[in-house]
Each structure stands twice: as structure tokens, then as C-alpha cells.
Amino acid sequence: TLPFGFRWSNRLIPLGTHEAAKHIRRQQLQWFKKRKGAGAWVQEMVSKSNASQPKPDDELWLDQDARAMAVDAGEAASENASGSVRFCFYTQVMVVMDPDPVRASYVASEILKALNDAGFTGRIETVNALDAYLGSLPGHGYPNLRRPLISTRNIADLLPVTSVWPGLANNPCSFFPPKSPPLMWPATDGATPFRFNLHDSDVGHTLVLGRTGSGKSVLLAMIAAQFRRYPDAQVFVFDVGYSMWTLAKAAGATHYDLAAGRPDSLRFQPLAQLDRPSERAWAVEWLETLLALQGVSVTSVIRAKLERAIELIAVNDPAHRTLTELTAQLQNATLSSAIRPYAVGGNYGQLLDAASDDLQEGRFQVFEMKHLLALDDKVAVPVLLYLFHRIEQRLDGSPTLIEIDEAWMALMHSLFGARINQWLLTLRKQNAAVVLATQSPSQLAQLSNRHTVVDSCPTRIYLPNPDAATPAQESLYRDLGLNDREISIIQGATAKRHYYVKSSAGSRLFELGLGPVALSFLATPSGSSMEETRRHLEALIALHGDDWPAVWLEERGHAAWARQFRQHHKSREDIQDEIQVA
């Protein structure tokens, strides 16, 4: 692709068999006459005057190219007569428009250079420029007499039947408001813009494959930030390694550090809504999972005891719908001892036996799972199943994005894998898109349900991988539907810069094109770890409060943007004050 715009016009004037035969015959005769130059004619006259026989050296006086072209014209006449191909007048014109004549001349010369490098000939029109332009317009068959006669076989090779995929101008999901804009406009090579959407029709499930250090976290953060452009959008992110922490704090999201072991760590009350019949059914299923994790086989008798105990505590005040109350109502030593680790005083009581739930109702929520995933399944599974359930409760038809980083770890687990599979199959109808990110195709290949995952994610984003063409990796990429050219693109792409997206609508290599201000909130600063950055920003938040983003921008050398942030923040406060006064 070329880094400027132009219009490429292709004009075909088809000819009938008899009309084409006349033009081919004329061309053949012209080439036949050109086969002998002046020297050949003189040599022939001398030979005739001496009545001598032709000599082998006489062939040297002939124009071999003209003779070959005459033979080629004869073959064209045979093909035309047989009807195996048709012949047409064909004209290619590339129209360059620019208010600056110098710029237009430069662009035209660059296009001609690119054509010559590809083995084509061309010229920049001068006297014939007007006719060439008119001939490029629909319905103008006569202007521009530069129209060589070629066969349909050649035309099939020359016609630009493919083009760079520009993406869809609007979000294609029918559940979104009409004419919703694309998710973002990434940077690309050439002049053709690219409009990026997660959705393929009304399915927004997306698979992201990228090795560590290739730019996956920045991409996920950018997608989460951009998704909030849609009215009433909800974003839920399951993060690993605090890569979304800075964005969450700056964007006003609620960030939960699960099982961090701090005094202010997040605590849940899974049984708080037992006054609802649907919640009681879910609670029984959830408690059965807890019992199974503790080695208790759930029978119909045990299920009946659980249901009875849940009915008893459902009438309590919300603050008393806890696991501690449940163990008291069970009146069964085996069941009580199995649930006691999750109650107050147990190993996991600080997470799952609160008198009130710390989980809020914000529209942008980030769950940091680094510490939780380091714990035993006996605690990680109940917590994540509860979070999944709460997210499902929030699905009200609003545009919803659910991002799961390091998704292969969740997919490898039978319970999580089954739940995510269910999401992939059903959440489309609730206007929710699931983005699954993992490090490599080899991790995906280990999943027993990989075909369901791949088939349910019509949009796939591949990050650079210099080993993509190795035998071990190539077969995995081919299983995902990539061809040689696409694997080569992924192999040659630059880490932390390029992303290759493929869907049923098209494919494109793109860049996020982020400036230093955006990267201040989406990426870890060079030379610092995420942990160091987080500690520093926590200190800024404690010292400056809501003004910390401006201070952070000033530290990064973006004073003008810091002033703009403060002006915008003050304007919002003034508007809120006016609303309160009114």
C-alpha cells in the first residue's frame, strides 16, 4: 500500500469476435512489417541481384522481437476464432488529486515508481491528461485512446479484484444503537483507513493470542477504554498482574484486588439476596460446589438439607444471610464442618462470609486475580463462580464487555471452562462480548474444548511471534485457519507495535498508534516494573486525591495535557454544582 490517496480506474471495452479479429490482424501485420529493418531489406536486395541462396547469417538482420510478436498475434487470432477467450480494449488510469500541484506531481511520480518496480510500464500524462481523466469516469468510453487490446485471460490477472480491508464504518451488532461508531480507528500502513470492531455481525467474542511482552496488555486496556464510548456500556475485566490498574484508577473504575491479604481486602456476601427464588436455586448449586471441593459427595438427602437451611436464613435480615448462619441452620456435623472453612474463623472466611458485600454496581470494574489464582482451588473456585454469577445478573441488554486475561488457566479448569463455554454460546443474546486472551496457540491446543472456543470467537487478534513459521508453531496457526501469507505477517510483525486481526469480514495488520499521554495510562513506563509504578501512583493518589492524573502527566513531561485535565475536571465539578443547586 502507498501512503497517500488516489483513484484507480479500470475501463473495459469488450469486442465481438469479428471486431477483435480485425484489430488483431492489424496488429499482426504491423509487427510482421517490423521484423525487417533497413539492413535486412538491403541484404535481401543484394541476395536477389546475385541470385544466391539465403545464408544462415541472414537471420541476424531480422528483428526477433517483432517476429515473436507477430507469431503471438497469430496465436491470439486463433484463440479469438476458437472462442476460448474474448478480447477487450483495456485502460488503467490512476487519478491523483491534490490542491498543491507540487504535492500532486510527487505522488504521481511515486505511483509510477511503484508500478515500474512491480514490472509494469506507465507514464504521467501531460497533453493527454484531460482525456485520461474523462476516460476514467463511468460512461466515457471514447476519451483516452490509450487502450491496448488484451485478452480476458490477461484482464483477470490485472483487475484489482481485492483491496485493503478498511473495516466496517459502523458497529455491525444489531443490539447496539443504530449507526454506532466502530470501536476505534487504529493506525495502518498506506492511506486506506481502518475501522476496528470486535463484532462480526452480532457476535463480539474475540480471541487474543500473544506471547509475553508482545503488547497484549496494552491492547486489552485500549479495548476496555474504547468500549466505554457506547452509551450505557459495561466493562468487566479479569486482570492478572495489575496491567489494568492505572487505567482503572484514572477512568474512575472500581478495582478489586482479590485475596490480596490486606486489612482492606475485598469481602463478599454470596447469600445476601436469598429472598429471591432465583438466588436460592443458584445458592444451592454454589454450596454443592463448596461441599464437593471439601470432599463431600452431594446426595439428594444433602441437597434437601441445603435447601431447607437456605429457606430458613432467607427470611433473616440481609446482614444475617451469611455462611455462619447457614452452618448453624444445617444441624449436620459433616455439612457444617465442610462449610466452616468458608465461614468467619475459617481459613477463607475473610473472603466469603461478610455481613455486607463489598462488590459495587459500577459500569467499569476490574478484578485483579494474581493473588487469588495463587491460592488453592478450594477458595479460588467459589470466589470466581460468585463473581461470574454477579456479572450475569448485570446483563440487562446494555453493551457489555467481559475481558479475561490469561484465559487458558480458567479454561483448563472444568468448572470455569464450562461456565466460559456457556458464556460464549449464550451471552450474544444479552449483548455481551467476551474477550479471551492467552499467550500462544500451544496453550489453546491443550484445551479439550478448544474447538468450541475457537468457533465461538469469529474475531481473532494475533500478536507478533518470530517463531510462528517454525514447524511446531506453524501447524497450530494453521489449525486456527491461517495461511502461509498470514503466518508470514505474524512472524515478521514488530512486538509491542503490530496486531493482526482476522474475521469473516476481512483481515488487517494494524497499530494502536498511541501517543505518550495515552501510554502513560495504558502501559508500564519504561525502566519500571508494574509493582513500582503502582506503589508510586498509590502515593500520588494519597497525596493529591483526584488531581493525581494531572500530577502524573506533569511527571511524565506532559504539562499541557495536565492543564487540560484540570480544566476539564473543574468544568465537570461546576456542572455537578449547578445540578445540585437546581
Each PLM stretch: what is its role?
Residues 478-537:
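Conserved P-loop NTPase
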